[in-house]
């Protein structure tokens, strides 16, 4: 469960980090992406552990709120699942069609940009 939560927060951060303040971005990145403890973050920024905890908790809530309103992560996951289905279909039905595979690769790359 904890790994899934970390992965989700890191994914949300990729989509919404530009909407966070610099301090929110730093705390949540250190905690979830870089695996710092609350104590390590509090020492680095010379604030209490409670202040760090409150900031991180508030930031997670903000990220979840953005996702509820904008659905960027969930839409991305749906599109990726569709790409996987299309790729499997192409590999099964048209295994020799390199041009079709190339088109799908290009479409997938444009999605990532």
Curated annotation (Swiss-Prot):
SUPFAM superfamilies in the record: Sigma3 and sigma4 domains of RNA polymerase sigma factors (SSF88659)
Pfam family, one: UPF0122
Gene3D superfamilies for the chain: Winged helix-like DNA-binding domain superfamily/Winged helix DNA-binding domain
Position of the signal peptide: none
Record InterPro entries: RNA_pol_sigma_r3/r4-like, UPF0122, UPF0122_fam_protein, WH-like_DNA-bd_sf
Cited function: Might take part in the signal recognition particle (SRP) pathway. This is inferred from the conservation of its genetic proximity to ftsY/ffh. May be a regulatory protein.
Membership in a protein family: Belongs to the UPF0122 family.
Family matches, as PANTHER family: UPF0122 PROTEIN CBO2450/CLC_2298, UPF0122 PROTEIN YLXM
Record's protein name: UPF0122 protein PEPE_0845
Naturally occurring in which organism (per UniProt): Pediococcus pentosaceus (strain ATCC 25745 / CCUG 21536 / LMG 10740 / 183-1w)
Source taxonomy: Bacteria, Bacillati, Bacillota, Bacilli, Lactobacillales
């Amino acid at each position: 469960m904890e790994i899934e939560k970390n992965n989700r927060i890191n994914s949300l951060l990729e989509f919404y980090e530009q909407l966070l303040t610099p301090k929110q971005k730093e705390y949540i990145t250190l905690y979830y992406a870089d695996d710092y403890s609350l104590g390590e973050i509090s020492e680095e920024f010379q604030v209490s552990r409670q202040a760090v905890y409150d900031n991180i908790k508030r930031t997670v809530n903000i990220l979840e709120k953005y996702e509820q309103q904008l659905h960027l992560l969930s839409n991305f996951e749906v599109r990726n699942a569709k790409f996987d289905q299309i790729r499997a279909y192409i590999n099964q039905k048209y295994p020799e069609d390199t041009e079709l595979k190339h088109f799908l690769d290009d479409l997938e790359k444009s999605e990532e940009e």
